[in-house]
Amino acid sequence: MDEIVKNIREGTHVLLPFYETLPELNLSLGKSPLPSLEYGANYFLQISRVNDLNRMPTDMLKLFTHDIMLPESDLDKVYEILKINSVKYYGRSTRADAVVADLSARNKLFKRERDAIKSNNHLTENNLYISDYKMLTFDVFRPLFDFVNEKYCIIKLPTLFGRGVIDTMRIYCSLFKNVRLLKCVSDSWLKDSAIMVASDVYKKNLDLFMSHVKSVTKSSSWKDVNTVQFSILNDPVDTEFINKFLEFSNRVYEALYYVHSLLYSSMTSDSKSIENKHQRRLVKLLL
């Protein structure tokens, strides 16, 4: 428990290994790989609590998270730490210290207003911006279309769950010699978003990767029709890399399970009020 609280209050990170060899690519747009246990067993424990919250009416979610949904300023904090003075979002600037893509639903918890759902058996979709592997679209590679000689490539990932995000990180670990994942204090600890910071480009592999992508998409520039789910590797990445990734993501999901459990206990408290011991513990933890 102390470790969970420490990660929430101080943040957590991991440095991923560099691989000189790019994995065999086979880009297919339109569908994500399905989840499986080898890509994170903790998710399947944590998703049970997410489903409990997913059943709650959204007006109640807004009420109980109003004071703990602080503005997500993690990207700004990363810019400050790395002394990044200028960033390039989707080709909007020709000169920058970093090229950036934010795939997260910044400062949002749910997708649409909704009443309560009777039971988990009646859930047909994930209405929360939490643990939704379908949120990872091919936009995660969009910065590479705009990358010239920037020092950093920075991605705000919408989720850490599923094969898609692990395959993506494995590819980035052959495109850049330094790839780090961070879950900052100033990110939302209600959601499984995180930041990837990559630097020291390995141009040989970047050129190979972009050649494959451009041949599949039949375009040398980014097209908005590419903002879809995708799969990119036929073969699973090696177990060593998966375990290194899970070393980081498990810390995040353990913290989220604790936070979500407190929130659910607060929302279902006998007091029928936002003034209860679970909410007080939650506020103390996150503020």
UniProtKB/Swiss-Prot annotation:
Pfam families, A to Z: Pox_mRNA-cap
Subunit structure comment from the entry: Interacts with the late transcription elongation factor VLTF-4/OPG110. Interacts with the late transcription factors VLTF-1.
Keywords: mRNA capping, mRNA processing, Transcription, Transcription regulation, Transcription termination, Virion
Keyword Nucleotidyltransferase included in the entry's annotation: no
Function: Acts with RNA polymerase to initiate transcription from late gene promoters.
Name of the molecule in the record: mRNA-capping enzyme regulatory subunit OPG124
Family affiliation: Belongs to the orthopoxvirus mRNA-capping enzyme regulatory subunit family.
Domain of life per record: Viruses
Listed GO biological process terms: DNA-templated transcription termination
